[in-house]
């Protein structure tokens, strides 16, 4: 009888995980924005100086942290080098340098010191989607978090970023960022 309940439990767990992944799949695709404007090309938008303001929310929507950021990008040899410096409201300072290679009109590959493997980017119309796993320090431990990042260009100066953060396929938070390109 114990074996029967064990197998039923396994079947229920597998069914739950399957249904969760089915209903949580992202049905929005970069190609959906093919004919939208203004067109975002990250190698142009992030070239030069950009300011950012953002907030981090937990899985329930509670704002847990906020930041301001200074960014500076250079585009050379088909690669955007984007230096980011974050100033968190709890006093933490953080730096990241992205190297994002433009593969073709729509596809990008990115790397950074705290990114696991390579980030995949897709640009269509006014939207840029970036998928990557980031090592995030949380309570003294380094945790791998998956980011599903969307940037939507609003005009020549403003872009809005919305990211879903996941661990083991489960949503653990959201990140909202407003970018302002500084005329250089």
Predicted regions and their residues:
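Amphipathic/hydrophobic helical signal segments and adjacent flexible N-terminal regions
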Residues: 1-47, 51-62, 184
């Amino acid at each position: 009888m114990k074996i029967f309940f064990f197998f039923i439990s396994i079947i229920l767990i597998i069914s739950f995980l399957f249904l969760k992944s089915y209903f949580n799949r992202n049905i929005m695709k970069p190609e959906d924005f093919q004919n939208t404007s203004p067109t975002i090309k990250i190698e142009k938008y992030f070239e030069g100086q950009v300011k950012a303001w953002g907030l981090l929310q937990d899985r329930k929507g509670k704002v847990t942290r906020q930041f301001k950021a200074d960014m500076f990008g250079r585009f050379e040899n088909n690669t955007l080098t984007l230096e980011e410096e974050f100033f968190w409201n709890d006093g933490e300072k953080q730096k990241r340098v992205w190297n994002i290679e433009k593969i073709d009109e729509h596809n990008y590959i990115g790397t950074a010191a705290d990114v696991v493997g390579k980030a995949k980017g897709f640009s269509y119309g006014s939207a840029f989607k970036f998928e990557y796993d980031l090592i995030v320090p949380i309570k003294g431990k380094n945790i791998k978090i998956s980011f599903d990042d969307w940037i939507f260009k609003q005009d020549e100066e403003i872009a809005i970023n919305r990211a879903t953060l996941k661990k083991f396929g489960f949503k653990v938070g959201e990140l909202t960022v407003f970018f302002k390109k500084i005329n250089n």
